[in-house]
Amino acid sequence: MIPAYIPNPAAALLGGGTPVDFGKCAKDGRRILGDGKTWRGLIGGIVVGIIFGLMQIFLYNYFNLEFLPKQTIITVCALATGALLGDMVKSYFKRRLGKDRGAKWPIADMYDMVVGSLVLMTLALLVTGNLNWFTENFDSVGFLIATIIAILILSPLLHRGTNIIGYLLGLKDVPW
């Protein structure tokens, strides 16, 4: 999940400039995504996530770190891209519900990137015929369940921690 956890904070650091929705509004009169989703943040976040994923591939191979999932270029790119796409889908629905940028939406805010990254990775593996990636990395049901539990516990903690740091650094308007 490293390539999925990195893009959101990287997008906040590198963001700014032209919004992904180009300032356009949906039929309800509200912005499609809002000013918080920019092309610079989207592209920068994905690139940084991919770089971290490539480092994970290198470390796995060089140091034989078998406790890490054996990532591929496909999984790294899908995880990094899916994390930010999941965040944008969540932002779209937040706007439809009338929630402002930075407004709390607890469950969605914590797991949007997890859902987006895992859905896109699964689709990418399906399209490329590499669904065996799951059985290669999760050789037992117990390990798969332990991984899911770790993701469910770590995601909110990492989300909250990075948001507090972003707030303290002046990169976010709110600490959540």
Swiss-Prot record:
**GO MF annotation terms:** CDP-2,3-bis-(O-geranylgeranyl)-sn-glycerol synthase activity
Write the record's keywords in alphabetical order, separated by commas: Cell membrane, Lipid biosynthesis, Lipid metabolism, Magnesium, Membrane, Phospholipid biosynthesis, Phospholipid metabolism, Transferase, Transmembrane, Transmembrane helix
Q: Which cysteines are cross-linked by disulfides? A: none
Q: Where are the transmembrane segments?
A: 41-61, 73-93, 114-134, 138-158
Biochemical pathway: Membrane lipid metabolism; glycerophospholipid metabolism
Name the chemical reaction catalysed here: 2,3-bis-O-(geranylgeranyl)-sn-glycerol 1-phosphate + CTP + H(+) = CDP-2,3-bis-O-(geranylgeranyl)-sn-glycerol + diphosphate
Q: What class of enzyme is it?
A: transferase
User: A single GO BP annotation from the record?
Assistant: glycerophospholipid biosynthetic process
- The question of whether Transport is a record keyword is answered with no
Write the Enzyme Commission number(s) for this entry: 2.7.7.67
Cofactor(s) needed by this chain: Mg(2+)
InterPro entries in the cross-refs: CarS, CarS_archaea
According to Swiss-Prot or TrEMBL, what is its membrane topology?
Multi-pass membrane protein
Q: Which GO terms describe its cellular component?
A: plasma membrane
Q: Which subcellular locations apply to this protein?
A: Cell membrane
Indicate whether Membrane appears among the record's keywords: yes
Similarity-based family:
Belongs to the CDP-archaeol synthase family.
User: Could you tell me what this protein does?
Assistant: Catalyzes the formation of CDP-2,3-bis-(O-geranylgeranyl)-sn-glycerol (CDP-archaeol) from 2,3-bis-(O-geranylgeranyl)-sn-glycerol 1-phosphate (DGGGP) and CTP. This reaction is the third ether-bond-formation step in the biosynthesis of archaeal membrane lipids.
Protein name (Swiss-Prot/TrEMBL): CDP-archaeol synthase
Gene from which the chain derives: carS
